[in-house]
Amino acid sequence: MAQLTCQNLCAGYDGRPVLQDLSFELLAGDYLCIVGENGSGKSTLMKTILGLQTPISGRILTGDGLRKNEIGYLPQQTVVQKDFPASVREIVLSGCQGRCGSRPFYNKEEKQLAAEAMDKMQITRLARRCYRELSGGQQQRVLLARALCATQKMLLLDEPVSGLDPKVTAEMYTLIEKLNREDGITVIMISHDVAAAVRYASHILHIGDTVFFGTRADYLQSPQGRLFDVKKGGDIQ
């Protein structure tokens, strides 16, 4: 049974579609990279999956035990967010807010979940540090740990390596791949890095004048894949 199904989706702003007639489905444990030119609708799709935006038409359905409030989200950071004056532990714990309901405090289980998420992201030693004092790569690990507190089923990542140097980028990709491969978490990631998409993803959704959805192997043989020369490591600008 599909964990996420997109049926004939039309999405956009003020009634003006950015995406039209988009359909695909993902199973639990899939790793989807969404690629395409700027303005093609990648972030619009992600916001619609999260329920932050209402479709113009069509539907997004969850299944296989996934509820819409069980999707973890790592958005692109703003300048203000990067300067947020809270401890690493406080930020990671805030990912448990959806589990608290009307309860105004975190319980033992939620604190343990945050501790485990920090351990997976290898940031336990930073727990008492102020978030705004961290490097960009460390901040992204904190936000990924926060997203993990919201779900053990599906993560949505909006360009999680944007602005990071090559070494830190490779480390982030490795952490994300490990969550997918070892923990079975479904990953949906927006990326401009086609080479990385082909290296790590099980499926690729290429949004542009024409749309491709399929496996990594099929993408390599598609017109979109050949256009960006992914076999040599292409980049969509």
What residue ranges belong to the model's regions?
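Conserved ABC ATPase signature
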Residues: C130-L134, Q138
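H-loop (His-switch) and adjacent beta-strand-loop-beta switch element
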Residues: H203-R216
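The feature captures the beta-strand-to-loop junction immediately N-terminal to the Walker
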Residues: V35-E37
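Catalytic Walker B motif of ABC-type/P-loop ATPase nucleotide-binding domains
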Residues: L155-D158
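Conserved ABC ATPase "signature" region
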Residues: K108-L126
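Helix N-cap at the start of a conserved alpha-helix in ABC-type nucleotide-binding domains
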Residues: P166-V168
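H-loop/switch region of ABC-family ATPase nucleotide-binding domains
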Residues: S191-H192
